[in-house]
């Protein structure tokens, strides 16, 4: 006989009380999405926004720290002129070599005529923050016409010198290398060397002269009062701690305080109705107790006769240093 199929047992219907007691099927429990508190969503979103803003701010600080030098220094690499264009005798020089024998600095040696009146002096010329040596030929010609020897060079990052981002520390190091080249290679006594700086190079000359009291003197052509303001006045500097990120200062007021050698200040007359002698003195001038001379000059694109007259008058008054001819 064929077997009878078992009759399925009827499933009793669920009462509404089961749902009221929180019962649910396993499938329904597995498919139900978890609930997230709106408060936690708000906190997570806030943390993400703060982290993104912090990353953006830190990135801005990093970019400003890496590129702020371009607001103060404006170097160029192509040297358009040489002293030969002004009829000056000169020798290209290279010094401050690396361990591999590669020179870091390049410049020009412009000797004085053998019978020149001030041939016992050698001027180390520190050019401005803009351009390169090719833009200084007229100034170098004016110095040569005075009858002094001249060494001019490009800082690292300028002209044909080694590539590097300019900075106050590197400028000071470059100037020290140039002094060492004069004393060790050219055998020029320190007491016969005059620093001559223009624009930001004048601020550099004050710092270097303060560290080398054995030099003959220093000439400061239009030193800048607050050069680093070119960085701090940038709109981006208001968003970050620029004073902590920028190390350069070139503070002529503070650097001039320990200056112990004679100084000549050649400053352009201010554009005002007051006489020049009633104008405020340049920053750092009043702090200097050593021999000093201040001359106001009318603005001129090239060194003028008053420039030469003031320079020679100052040279005549320089005291003779031990060991100098």
Residue locations for each model-derived region?
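An N-terminal hydrophobic leader/cap segment in hydrolases
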Residues: 53-97
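Membrane-embedded segments
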Residues: 100-183
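Short alpha-helix in the alpha/beta-hydrolase fold that links the catalytic acid
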Residues: 139, 252, 261, 274-286
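Alpha/beta-hydrolase fold nucleophile elbow
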Residues: 187-199
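Glycine-rich nucleophile elbow surrounding the catalytic serine of serine-hydrolase chemistry
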Residues: 197-207
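Active-site nucleophile loop of the alpha/beta-hydrolase fold
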Residues: 219-229, 248-251
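Short beta-strand/loop motif that positions the catalytic acidic residue
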Residues: 258-260, 265-269
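C-terminal catalytic histidine-bearing segment of alpha/beta-hydrolase fold enzymes
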Residues: 282, 287-325
